[in-house]
C-alpha cells in the first residue's frame, strides 16, 4: 500500500503522538530530577515545566486514542488544540529569535526581580556570580545582592555579575529555544494535516455503508 492510504496515515499519526508522549514524559522526569537534586529550587519553574509536560502528554494521548480508534470527535479536538498550540508557539518562537540585547536585559531584569532570595542564591552559586547588573538605576539593589552572596562566590574580589554572565549566553539560548520551538511548531502543523487527512478517510475494514 502506498503511503497516503488509511493504514499509512494511521501509523504516521500514531508515531507522531508517541514522540509527543516521550517528550512530555521527558519534561516531567527532567523537572523532577532537577528538583530532587536541588538544581532548581523554584516551585514555579518546576511546576511550569511539569505542567507543559502533562499538557503535551494529554494532547498525545487524545491524538493516539483518536488515531487507533478512528474517533471523529477526538481527532477534531486534537486538531483544534494543535492549531491553538501552533499559533502560540510560533509567536513565542519568533519573538525569541527577534529579541535584541536591550530586550534580553529587560526580560532578565524582570525575572531577577521576581525571584526569591533562595532562588537568587542558588543561581549565584551555580553561575559563580553576584548580583544582576551594576547599573546606575540598580546600584543599591546590586550592593545588597553582593552583600548576601559574598560567601557563595569562589573569588569574592573578582566576582562577575550574574547579569553579564546570563546575557553572554542569552542570545545563543534564545536562538536555540526559538529554533526548537519553530521545529515543533511545524510538527504540530504536520499533526493537524495528518489528523485531518486520516479523519476523512474511510476505514477499509469498516461497514461500507457506514459514515467514514
UniProtKB/Swiss-Prot annotation:
Residues 1-12, 66-72, 197-212 are cytoplasmic. Its main location: membrane. GO terms for cellular component: membrane. It holds the Pfam family Tetraspanin. Residues 34-44, 94-175 are extracellular. The keyword Electron transport does not apply. It is found in: Membrane. Glycans are attached at residues 100, 109, 117, 134. InterPro entries: Tetraspanin/Peripherin, Tetraspanin_animals. The keyword Lyase does not apply. Keywords: Glycoprotein, Membrane, Transmembrane, Transmembrane helix. The chain crosses the membrane at residues 13-33, 45-65, 73-93, 176-196. It is a multi-pass membrane protein. Belongs to the tetraspanin (TM4SF) family. This is Tetraspanin-31-B. The gene is tspan31-b.
